[in-house]
Amino acid sequence: MRKITIATRGSKLALWQANHISDLLREEYPGIEVQLLKIKTKGDKILDVPLAKVGGKGLFVKEIEEALLDGRADLAVHSMKDVPTELPEGLEVGIIPPREAETDTLLSVKYDSLKDLPAGAVVGTSSLRRQSQVLALRDDLKIESLRGNLDTRVGKLLNGEFDAIVVATAGLNRLKLSAPKSEILGPPTFLPAVAQGALGIEYRIEDTEIQDILAFLHDEMTARQVKAERGFLTGLDGGCQVPIAAWSQLESDQVKLTGFVADIDGSSPIRMEKTGPAEDAWDIGLALAEEVLAAGAKEILDRVYDKC
């Protein structure tokens, strides 16, 4: 069997994800040779600017996709929440492994929960989605930019730079990171980013051999959830750096999608739901986006883009 090269960012979380897929490949195909190609992306290099102000989509994937296109790598493992809805010609993300937790977690050294934070407490995040939802629940808190890899962000909290931070639960679980105090922030009150907690494997469409090798990793239930949520994001023409959230639930052959858009200060929230056949997940996402836009989301998103 051919030697496989996996393109990945160099952060601890990205390496965990790439090594996780490597381990699964070795278990499935004893003797297979797998190597990692570490690549620095634009998002990794610009750490002194809030993500919303860096601009552009694909901050954490563009350079990795270039390695796929020029043949240096056979596949890439992404956090699906970082992957733009439009991919370069010749590439696809067709393998979606089972999803980890889609929730966020509030970490603190002293405070048990979001409601226990004192007025004026400093909460760290560079996600406009998290900022918007935190302020919708607690408009007396102060949000400050928090950049860096996940272990770096947790370290800043433990060093006393913030009263609390909000990060993805999946990353904490994967790297076994924690803080003295924590609270899960999840649906229905706190909605995740599109495809949060899900991994995606990207490859060249023409490489049918690699697709056959990877097929055992695919989880159709997760794939349908991701399709519904990414359909919603596509319909809103949003990137990962806007206050858009989506959460899909599968019940037998039906998908129930909840979409959320709000201003960055938590005001003017729009939250709507749509249910339909799971096989039509993408179209359900697009349809919900149309309804949310008609309800006022276009004006909200225009304001957000003007501020960025």
Curated annotation (Swiss-Prot):
The lineage of its organism: Bacteria, Pseudomonadati, Thermodesulfobacteriota, Desulfovibrionia, Desulfovibrionales. Tetrapolymerization of the monopyrrole PBG into the hydroxymethylbilane pre-uroporphyrinogen in several discrete steps. CDD domains: PBP2_EcHMBS_like. GO terms for biological process: protoporphyrinogen IX biosynthetic process. GO terms for molecular function: hydroxymethylbilane synthase activity. The modification S-(dipyrrolylmethanemethyl)cysteine is found at C240. Its cofactor is dipyrromethane. Gene3D superfamilies: Periplasmic binding protein-like II, Porphobilinogen deaminase, C-terminal domain. The porphobilinogen subunits are added to the dipyrromethane group. It catalyses: 4 porphobilinogen + H2O = hydroxymethylbilane + 4 NH4(+). One of its GO terms (cellular component) is cytoplasm. Pathway: Porphyrin-containing compound metabolism; protoporphyrin-IX biosynthesis; coproporphyrinogen-III from 5-aminolevulinate: step 2/4. It is an enzyme of class 2 (transferase). Monomer. Belongs to the HMBS family. InterPro entries: HemC, Porphobilin_deaminase_cofac_BS, Porphobilin_deaminase_N, Porphobilinogen_deaminase_C, Porphobilinogen_deaminase_C_sf. Pfam families: Porphobil_deam, Porphobil_deamC. Its EC number is 2.5.1.61. Signal peptide: none annotated. SUPFAM superfamilies: Periplasmic binding protein-like II, Porphobilinogen deaminase (hydroxymethylbilane synthase), C-terminal domain. Binds 1 dipyrromethane group covalently. This is Porphobilinogen deaminase. Keywords: Porphyrin biosynthesis, Transferase.
